[in-house]
């Protein structure tokens, strides 16, 4: 069953999402002015996470190399600069490229819940695809987020604003949680976690 805002708020008060925003934020009010932001916080049947400003990496081509998920070479990634202007803080994801970021919020997934992370339509309409990612029962940490820019133009990816939506699905209690089996991505810090096997 897909869980609603009442359930999300209750579980957040027990530490499921931190920091937690109980309503959907669409505007900030610095100096009493309405500043639009990419929405984040609790919605009717989900929660919009924010992208952390701490780290954003993009893939680069190294001639003569092929990326291997079993032996990932971190040299294929480069850090990007956090930019700032009147619209906010942002990273730039080049056209036809792929990047990795991390969620600002830390999560603790209950033992009978699986979370699915999906993209926001605002970014999808610009050609930015957020990889659909699960967070399994018992998983804890900051989600590493994957982004693909399928458009022919560079695109801003805003930090500290909404980047993806979480959907919470309840199932029968499982025998072994992600935490119980010591999953390889358990307790990810607020930094990009690279591929592991």
Model-derived features with residue positions:
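DUTPase catalytic domain/fold
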Residues: 1-197
């Amino acid at each position: 069953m897909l869980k609603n805002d009442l359930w999300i708020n209750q579980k957040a008060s027990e530490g499921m999402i931190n920091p937690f925003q109980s309503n959907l934020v669409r505007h900030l009010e610095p100096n009493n002015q309405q500043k639009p932001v990419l929405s984040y916080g609790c919605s009717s049947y989900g929660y919009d996470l924010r992208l952390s400003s701490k780290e954003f990496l993009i893939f680069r081509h190294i001639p003569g190399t092929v990326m291997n998920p079993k032996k990932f070479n971190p040299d294929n990634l480069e850090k990007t600069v956090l930019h700032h202007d009147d619209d906010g803080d942002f990273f730039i994801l080049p056209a036809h490229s792929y990047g990795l970021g991390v969620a600002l919020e830390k999560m603790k997934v209950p033992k009978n819940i699986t979370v699915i992370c999906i993209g926001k339509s605002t970014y999808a309409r610009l050609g930015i695809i957020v990889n659909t990612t699960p967070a399994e029962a018992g998983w804890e940490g900051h989600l590493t987020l994957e982004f693909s820019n399928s458009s022919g133009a560079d695109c801003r990816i805003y930090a500290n604003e909404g980047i993806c939506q979480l959907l919470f699905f309840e199932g029968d209690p499982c025998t072994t949680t992600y935490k119980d089996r010591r999953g390889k991505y358990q307790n990810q810090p607020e930094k990009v976690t690279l591929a592991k096997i």
